[in-house]
Amino acid sequence: MKGGWHEARAAGSYTLARQWPPRFDVSADARFPAVRRGRLARQIRQDLWRALKGLRGFSPVIQIAAAEDGLTVTAGGRLPTNVPGVETQIRELLQDPAHRARWIAWAKERDA
């Protein structure tokens, strides 16, 4: 646990969750280029939390898996009640060009 967040790294995957074990009651997926998984997950988690912080009981989870052409990100988390439109909000956040550009720039590999 790092700063109240659980991190799990495995071959080809990375998971960041507030509660363990992670659970997706709501989620959306998106594809990303190959970048540093931990940095990408933390940036998405921050903006996901900002977008959904008004949802009582929401606990974010970000899961990133290696794919042939980059990464597959699953963003969402625990939500004790069914709230219409939440998955759409998450999907729109993951597809927002301004957010994506910032996340990718922050998570790109840096030369030493």
Residues of each region from the PLM?
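Short, charge-patterned binding micro-sites
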Residues: 19-24, 61-72
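Short, internal acidic amphipathic alpha-helical interface segments
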Residues: 36-61
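Residue-level recognition of well-ordered beta-strand positions that form the cores
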Residues: 13, 29, 63, 74-78
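Residues at beta-strand starts and edge strands
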Residues: 12, 56-58, 69-73
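Helix-rich interaction surfaces within compact, conserved domain-sized segments
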Residues: 67-112
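Short histidine-centered catalytic/ligand-binding loop motif
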Residues: 27-37
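N-proximal, solvent-exposed amphipathic alpha-helical segments enriched in charged/polar residues
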Residues: 1-6, 38, 42-46, 89-102
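N-terminal, Lys/Arg- and Ser/Thr-rich interaction peptides
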Residues: 1-27
